[in-house]
């Protein structure tokens, strides 16, 4: 290629880059495809097209362009890695893993591939493999903010809190403006009076340059420190501030959309005849559902400690599937009117979902503790009649109190940071669970959190019997097992069951008015 061509290509790619930064992705694709005809061996052009398709949520199109690029540039690391990402976005994790490994065969120091393999193994709850890849990424570049955070989360999930704290301090030193580090530290630290970490947070909370996200991170972490110290007034003050500020980050939040979703579900299942669904699918699936902070993690640790089960943690398989199906009113009506009542269509859907669960482990019973699957119980009954559903039933005021004093990584939980919406959401959940119990009866096992922590052995035996599993001592001694946890309960699951969590909200009714709006009795 002569100098004129190189100069021309550089100018054109600069224009494409500007369009990409402006999020003009269709124009990026159009202009890049024109360039591709003249320069078919330039990896960066394929990457611009594929990455733009990612941004437009056209993952199949992205995969097509990256597979074409593989034919022309079979040893280009960026192409191989992006092909893996395309497969991962399409839930083909086996092919994704193969391409990430191909990248590392070409370039063992390819940082994005180590990170993506870490994410992939993390999604499959293969915590040791994930940790290895994050550690490799750390060894390649320990000055990367995201790499440090991934290592912290991975070590915390494994219960390696001392190692996690060391990297958090490293993150503090290298990226002092990152307030996420304070929140991460607070989750795995028990604060005592005059704790230096608390003093550090208090010294920067009034910095005028902090944005809403930074302020909420700090207030949640400070609230946790005062909660540990049993300083109720300061705990309440910072909890209120944390939630007030966090809610401001949810622009144009519309709670009515939540209410509509709940009503739609009940409407479509009101007169549905479940007994007609005879297909024998789901024997190797256990779903633990309930509100967040209702004891789902405890149940997951207990059941996943059994030799015949594999704990998938909070899998997004079910929720992602239905959220894609229900993009608009027409797609919802079509799903209920056509696919759900068509035996062949139902069988195809259940096989599609089941194949994704089998990626965790083909030989064991998969335990999915995504709490929000309570919304999809009717569908689970339809698609997996032999599955087991366990409802973690805790005093809803206790769950709500715990929700309000914690921050969640999930982006769509605006209701969790507003007292009025939180109370309404809990009551929506209660009504929907009552609806499912009325319609499905013993298909749902009610595990009462208060009974479980009061008599763990007796309740564990009942739960295992419902799951058609023999009792094993490991299920009672679950804290001795190395089952990873990536949820807010990451610190608590390493401790023995504690009864002090029962009626924990009672002393806070005067501080948080929304607790009075929640029905005392669980559904």
What are these regions (language model features)?
Residues 8-38, 48-51, 55:
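Alpha-helical segment of the N-proximal tetratricopeptide repeat
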Residues 279-382:
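Phosphate-binding active sites in nucleotide-utilizing proteins
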Residues 165, 186, 198-209, 219-285, ...:
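PAPS-dependent sulfotransferases, especially Golgi type II membrane carbohydrate sulfotransferases
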Residues 17, 21, 44-55, 78-89, ...:
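Conserved alpha-helical positions within TPR/SEL1-like repeat arrays
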